[in-house]
From Swiss-Prot:
ATP binds at residues 32-39. Keywords: ATP-binding, Cell membrane, Membrane, Molybdenum, Nucleotide-binding, Translocase, Transport. Part of the ABC transporter complex WtpABC involved in molybdate/tungstate import. Responsible for energy coupling to the transport system. GO terms for molecular function: ABC-type tungstate transporter activity; ATP binding; ATP hydrolysis activity. This is Molybdate/tungstate import ATP-binding protein WtpC. Its EC number is 7.3.2.6. Residues 2-226 form the ABC transporter domain. The gene is wtpC. Pfam families: ABC_tran. GO terms for cellular component: plasma membrane. It is a peripheral membrane protein. It is found in: Cell membrane.
Amino acid sequence: MLKVNNLSKIWKDFKLKNVSFEIDREYCVILGPSGAGKSVLIKCIAGILKPDSGRIILNGEDITNLPPEKRNVGYVPQNYALFPNKNVYKNIAYGLIIKKVNKLEIDRKVKEIAEFLNISHLLNRDVKTLSGGEQQRVALARALILNPSILLLDEPTSAVDIKIKESIISELKKIKHIPVLHITHDLAEARTLGEKVGIFMNGELIAFGDKSILKKPKNKKVAEFLGFNIIDDKAIAPEDVIIKDGNGGEVVNIIDYGKYKKVFVKYNGYIIKAFTERDLNIGDNVGLEFREQTKLT
């Protein structure tokens, strides 16, 4: 179990402000825009940065001031940080070699983790010849082979295309035996992977809970970040807005995604976002119906 208590840190232009949460054997996704403080949080947990105040407790042990190598934390940075002069096998085995594990045990563990992540065919490859997705899997294998108490992932799919991203997410879903803290700005990843979800804004954790917070935000800040329409004290997801015949609204902008369109409708003084397959043009008059609304506090 990971417990973060009142963690604060100022680093360069980024800051954390009294962040507190806990996760057990759950996949936790931390969402937020660039500069929100997500990476500062994960670096503090990994031991790369020392917090200005607060506590980090891992499985009952206070690790706040421990050096990174004594935390039993698996950390995969955004740039993967692989050794370019070593092949895949040696990159994965590196931590075990440093710990002076015997060669037979190293070989067994490397092959086991490589099979788990579907990279057995890459073991003899030079890492410089790997794609971004392959490098990500190697970095993940190098972290998991040390049997960490928690896995920390900093934007693990940010540098790969959509097809590779889907493949990596499929591999991440396999990790069930330890807590995972996954930093991203991708809402789809949070919906797919998150058993717990946190939302960062300006260094503060403004929401934390199960993934239902993505469908029913409790306050305006969270609703705005998630792209909800806000009418008075209610949040309405764009997918819960039905466009129909009528004269209540005027189409003011359209983004065409092929099969469907994202439509912006001026309605009672608000700009309402909706998705539709209807053939519409800017200036068309339409009616709106709202299926589900969440009251904001």
